[in-house]
């Protein structure tokens, strides 16, 4: 099968590489390309107008991301083509003597004088629909002014968060990228980063539900790419922002974040430096009820009041050097430092339901838990781009990456029991009289976790336009090697040892995991006419995983090879409508922390573990979407995912009331969804409305698992709705008032049922200093409705219920000030797809 794939891929690449560019026989088509006169890069969003000798408009178009445009006309005799883009001097080309077909490349010159004196009042649309993705420009989004990156993501079409706070797209897990490169963070680390990152630092969010073969196949739901702001034109530019929040639920506390972005572009260099820092205290009240025993006759109620804090710093420095007219050398360095900690005194009551009439409590447990974590990440990228032929956008890009992550965590738990009922006291007396251990003797533990991860990656990409710039071929190869080292130690504590003293070493576990991934891909797109275009791709990935559980003398790992096809088909019957159909086959590789077999305690009776034998999950994805009037999108989709492992499997011991969450290939999940996205619909000149609405039908069927103590032969279907809406009123004197909110109905997440929740927010903002400064006041979660409830059912018995009251309601004040010109074009750099699974 591997030989067959390589043969097919080589045939595709060879045929495409030797396909000679030629003029299209359709005499109604004019094609060309627009570039920056200084960098030579293709310019996007250039307005191209074809005018006759009387200056009447004959045809118009806009350049794509590579600077290419297509015009249609019956004749070019006596016509001129005019080019315009904000920040550049206008240009025009006479078509006298030019035959219908390809127009020579046009270079636009930056208009430095205009940028220094003019006030630019235009804005990009909130949503832009590209060939294979939706782009959300967040500059006008109310939540971006004072909110964090999580608030901004909630406004993106199809984006939701699961019960553990992980990002999902259309109900499926996604790979999260930052500036065209994977985030290099585990689930909790990414959550902390997004909550602490200022929304004003974000330029756009790309929602790629069906990535092409150029991207890694990782991510069942696709890719969400968060792009931050950068500078473009000559000179010094940048921005500063600060945001403070005051929250009073469940207790009064404050949070804050700030960012600084600086950029300088000279004749041959482009330098960017950014810093983001945040401190995010939080309070959480969690009540958990678990039924256990014969016929679930006993109840364990746990009340957990915790306080904690996330804090961190991110620094990024990038440098591009134009070493010749066709060669660019670049480097990127990033540092991410973050830490967290919490302290949680816990009280548990154990009730005997057989004595429920008098509600006599059996016993109680007073528990104290605390945890501190720290993560340091360092990454570096060196990239090189060579342009062979600007008129064909023919270029070669090489990326070499290295990432190092170090994470340390320490956990403390102390549990003290008290016999409250005569029955409990009698049990204790009987045990002591028989010379047995006191069943109500306290216990506890200290544990420490050490993790190191190193990733090396090399990627080569080649691309060029074909067929008079109406087609494009992309091909490339990639190799990635990663090694993670995990060490875990547990120390047992028993009274009368002082609570702050660490006990004796009771367990030691060492787990090492390595992975090699080798990939080849080819991708071809073609515009067959002004109405029809298509894209097909094929990617092959060969994976060599190795796991070594040293303390158990246990090894795991099985090589596997997969082929991932994808197909896109677009039909544009008119300028007001687009119909798209796409199919993709993708996988979810196990995250490194999902493979870790160490036991991590949530509380004395609940813990989670990984599985070193966890296998990848695979998904088929089919999507049909339509776009009307550029701002209304209707989408229907279906996915079938086997070896589903996105949520942990609950292994519930009904006799003891203990609950183990284990990562496992749980079963098969099928999902069908309908989505509507309405972007900035004008009700009046001063009132706009934005709406994202999603309906999902989910069916989960568990694989038979003889190791489960409950929930065998489990299957469940559910329907759910989620949505986001905002309305903005544009007031005089550059004031704006906005109301926005999001909500979701109950939804099935594997074995669990997540209750519905919603939130309503309001903001009032003022722009000044010619629009360079903005001050925004915002009220979050006005009705205190953003609480998460979770339940677990065995048949018609609710065996577990959790109510999480987390601090969300509050008021925030944010300020931003920008200086400089505009936004920088991004180059094809970075190859850390696999490091998003750290």
Role assignments for model-derived ranges:
Residues 35-39, 47-51, 82-88, 100-142, ...:
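Short, acidic, small-residue-rich periplasmic hinge/interaction motif at the N-terminus
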Residues 102-107, 149-151, 190-193, 207, ...:
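N-terminal periplasmic accessory domains that precede
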Residues 155, 182-209:
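Short acidic/polar hinge/loop motifs at secondary-structure boundaries
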Residues 202, 217-224, 232-286, 310-313:
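Outer-membrane beta-barrel translocator/receptor signature
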Residues 227-242, 284-290, 301, 311-318, ...:
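Surface-exposed extracellular loop regions of Gram-negative outer-membrane beta-barrel proteins
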Residues 303, 455-459, 502-509, 633-692, ...:
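Outer membrane beta-barrel strand-and-loop segments of large Gram-negative receptors
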Residues 316-338, 364-548, 572, 576, ...:
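Face-selective signature of the C-terminal outer-membrane beta-barrel domain
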Residues 509-513, 587-636, 640, 659-673, ...:
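Outer-membrane beta-barrel signature, preferentially recognizing the C-terminal barrel domain
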């Amino acid at each position: 099968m591997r030989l067959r794939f390589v043969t097919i891929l080589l045939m595709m690449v060879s045929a495409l590489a030797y396909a000679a560019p030629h003029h299209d026989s359709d005499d109604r088509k004019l094609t060309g390309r627009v570039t920056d006169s200084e960098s030579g890069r293709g310019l996007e969003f250039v307005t191209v107008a074809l005018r006759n000798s009387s200056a009447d408009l004959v045809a118009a178009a806009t350049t794509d991301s590579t600077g290419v445009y297509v015009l249609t006309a019956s004749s070019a005799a006596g016509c001129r083509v005019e080019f315009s883009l904000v920040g550049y001097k206008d240009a025009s080309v006479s078509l006298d003597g030019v035959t219908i077909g390809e127009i020579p490349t046009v270079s636009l010159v930056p208009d430095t004088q205009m940028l220094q004196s003019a006030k630019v009042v235009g804005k990009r649309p909130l949503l832009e629909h590209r060939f294979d993705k939706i782009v959300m420009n967040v500059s006008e989004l109310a939540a971006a002014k004072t909110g964090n990156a999580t608030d901004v993501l909630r406004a993106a079409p199809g984006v939701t968060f699961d019960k553990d706070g992980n990002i999902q797209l259309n109900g499926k897990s996604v790979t999260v990228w930052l500036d065209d490169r994977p985030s290099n963070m585990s689930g909790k680390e990414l959550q902390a980063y997004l909550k602490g990152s200022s929304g004003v630092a974000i330029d756009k969010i790309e929602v790629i539900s069906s990535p092409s073969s150029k991207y890694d196949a990782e991510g069942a739901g696709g890719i969400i790419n968060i792009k931050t702001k950068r500078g473009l034109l000559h000179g010094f530019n940048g921005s500063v922002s600060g945001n403070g929040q005051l929250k009073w639920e469940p207790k009064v506390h404050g949070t804050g974040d700030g960012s600084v972005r600086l950029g300088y572009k000279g004749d041959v260099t482009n330098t960017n430096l950014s810093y983001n820092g945040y401190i995010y205290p939080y309070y959480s009240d969690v009540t958990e009820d678990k039924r256990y025993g014969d016929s679930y006759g006993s109840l364990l109620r746990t009340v957990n009041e915790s306080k904690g804090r996330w804090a961190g710093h991110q620094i990024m420095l990038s440098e591009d050097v134009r070493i010749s007219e066709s060669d660019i050398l670049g480097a990127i360095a990033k540092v991410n430092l973050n830490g967290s900690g919490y302290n949680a005194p816990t009280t548990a009551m154990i009730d005997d339901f057989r004595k429920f009439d008098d509600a006599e409590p059996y016993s109680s447990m007073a528990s104290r838990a605390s945890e501190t974590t720290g993560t340091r990440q360092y990454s570096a990228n060196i990239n090189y781009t060579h342009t062979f032929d600007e008129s064909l956008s023919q270029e070669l890009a090489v990326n070499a990456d290295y990432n190092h992550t170090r994470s340390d965590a320490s956990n403390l738990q102390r549990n003290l029991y008290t016999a409250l009922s005569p029955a409990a006291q009698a049990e204790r007396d009987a045990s002591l009289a028989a010379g047995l251990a006191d069943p109500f003797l306290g216990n506890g533990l200290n544990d420490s976790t050490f993790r190191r991860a190193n990733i090396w990656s090399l990627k080569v990409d080649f691309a060029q336009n074909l067929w008079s710039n109406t087609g494009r071929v992309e091909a490339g190869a990639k190799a990635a090697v990663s090694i993670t080292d995990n060490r875990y130690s547990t120390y047992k504590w028993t009274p009368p040892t002082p609570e702050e003293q660490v006990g004796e070493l009771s367990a030691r576990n060492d787990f090492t995991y390595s992975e090699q991934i080798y990939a080849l891909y080819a991708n071809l797109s073609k515009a067959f006419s002004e109405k029809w275009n298509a894209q097909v791709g094929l990617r092959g990935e060969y994976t060599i995983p190795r796991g070594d559980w040293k303390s158990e003398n246990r090894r795991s790992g099985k090589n596997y090879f997969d082929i991932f096809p994808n197909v896109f088909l677009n039909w544009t019957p008119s300028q007001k409508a687009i119909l798209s159909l796409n199919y993709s086959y993708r996988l979810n590789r196990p995250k490194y922390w999902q493979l870790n077999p160490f036991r991590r305690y949530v509380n004395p009776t609940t813990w989670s573990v990984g599985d070193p034998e966890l296998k990848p999950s695979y998904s088929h994805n089919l999507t049909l979407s339509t776009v009307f009037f550029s701002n209304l999108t209707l989408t229907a989709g279906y996915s079938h995912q086997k070896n589903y492992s996105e949520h942990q499997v609950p292994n519930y011991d009904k006799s003891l009331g203990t609950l183990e969450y284990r990562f496992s290939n749980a079963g098969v999940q099928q999902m069908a969804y309908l989505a509507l996205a309405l972007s900035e619909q004008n009700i009046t000149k001063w009132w706009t409305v934005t709406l994202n609405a999603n309906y999902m039908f989910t069916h989960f069927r568990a694989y038979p698992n003889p190791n489960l103590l409950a929930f065998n032969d489990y299957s469940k279907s559910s329907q759910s709705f989620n949505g986001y809406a905002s309305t903005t009123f544009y007031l005089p004197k550059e004031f704006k008032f906005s109301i926005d909110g999001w909500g979701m109905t109950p939804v099935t997440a594997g074995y669990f049922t997540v209750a519905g929740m919603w939130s309503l927010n309001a903001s009032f903002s003022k722009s000044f200093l010619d629009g360079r400064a903005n001050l925004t006041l915002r009220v979050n979660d006005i009705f205190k409705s953003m609480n998460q409830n979770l339940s677990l059912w065995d048949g018609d018995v609710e065996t577990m219920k959790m109510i999480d009251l987390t601090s969300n309601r509050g008021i925030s004040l944010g300020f931003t000030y920008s200086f400089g010109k505009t936004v920088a074009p991004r180059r094809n750099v970075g190859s850390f797809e696999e490091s998003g699974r750290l």
